């Protein structure tokens, strides 16, 4: 799945769209996504000047976005009408730093899959080595229901 299809599914945009490509998807079971970590990411202006490290929370967000694609595709939710929102994170661990130039591979496996609440085990890797892992919980919500009324 290329970036155009990803942008049709996810409401995220620059600078927080953190998925560049979906390499594999097995609806209802698992997904593998890719994030190219560029030195041009705005976060590196402050994290950290002179020794840029990709923040752990960005790795978790990238995992969540990949998991959101799996939820939307697996549950046959209407594209452009739903967003997947965080419901919880358990057992998050950061094993190694992620640097500009790294290619982050994001692997998620379904533990339970429901519109109201899904749970997935996520692993992030660089060069085949685990850099982070977590269990993520998320819920699918209609965009019209989560937009703040001004």
Swiss-Prot record:
Which Pfam family, giving just one, matches this sequence?
A: FabA
* Superkingdom to which the source organism belongs: Bacteria
Q: Catalysed reaction per UniProt? A: a (3R)-hydroxyacyl-[ACP] = a (2E)-enoyl-[ACP] + H2O
Instruction: Name the cystine pairs.
Output: none
GO cellular component terms, alphabetically, are: cytoplasm; membrane
Q: Where is the active site?
A: 47
Keyword Lipid metabolism included in the entry's annotation: yes
Q: What does the record list as GO biological process?
A: fatty acid biosynthetic process; lipid A biosynthetic process
Function, as annotated, reads:
Involved in unsaturated fatty acids biosynthesis. Catalyzes the dehydration of short chain beta-hydroxyacyl-ACPs and long chain saturated and unsaturated beta-hydroxyacyl-ACPs.
What's the protein called, per UniProt?
Answer: 3-hydroxyacyl-[acyl-carrier-protein] dehydratase FabZ
State the organism named in the record.
Aquifex aeolicus (strain VF5)
Task: List the top taxonomic levels of the source.
Answer: Bacteria, Pseudomonadati, Aquificota, Aquificia, Aquificales
Protein's gene: fabZ
